[in-house]
Amino acid sequence: TGVRVLFRSIASIDGTTYRFDSDGAATKTSGNDYTVEGKYVKVFDAKNNKYYYMEEEFLEHPGIADGKVSDLDLLAAVCDAEAGDQGVVGMEAVALCVLNCTIDQYKEFPSQIRYVVYQGKPTQYAVVTDGALLKRLKGQFEDRTNAYAAAKAAMEVFSNYVNHGTKRT
């Protein structure tokens, strides 16, 4: 009941999410398995066959809810926001932490990187809500080169583990 505006271009009306263009015309979002519940976004993870709660920034941050931001770009942004002052080793550890959550056998964590990063109730990564991640998503990195190097290295280590059983060290 009522309208809850989440961002200048997104609103939830009676549990249905709409996107508004610059002229104010509303379009019902389709193909997305999510609903707005208070300050959280309830998302259905088809792989885990389970619902998870995301922070409202899931809809507010451009390219996240619709999946337009690639896993690599999101992971690099998280690495820089969480551990930008810790060099490649620290950033790679952050990336591996996110990636490891995607294969949690107990399904306490979602199966997609964007879902893990934005998971709420409780908040998994404070950089989602404190503005640090959004800053990186807008291109303002502290150490872009090392963030991408760490994200790529972690993705390779993780892929080798999942596909070949190679240790994640």
Regions found by a protein language model. Give the residues of each.
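Extracellular adhesion/carbohydrate-binding repeat motifs centered on closely spaced tryptophans
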Residues: 1-63
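Bacterial extracytoplasmic/cell-wall-associated proteins, especially those involved in peptidoglycan
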Residues: 65-169
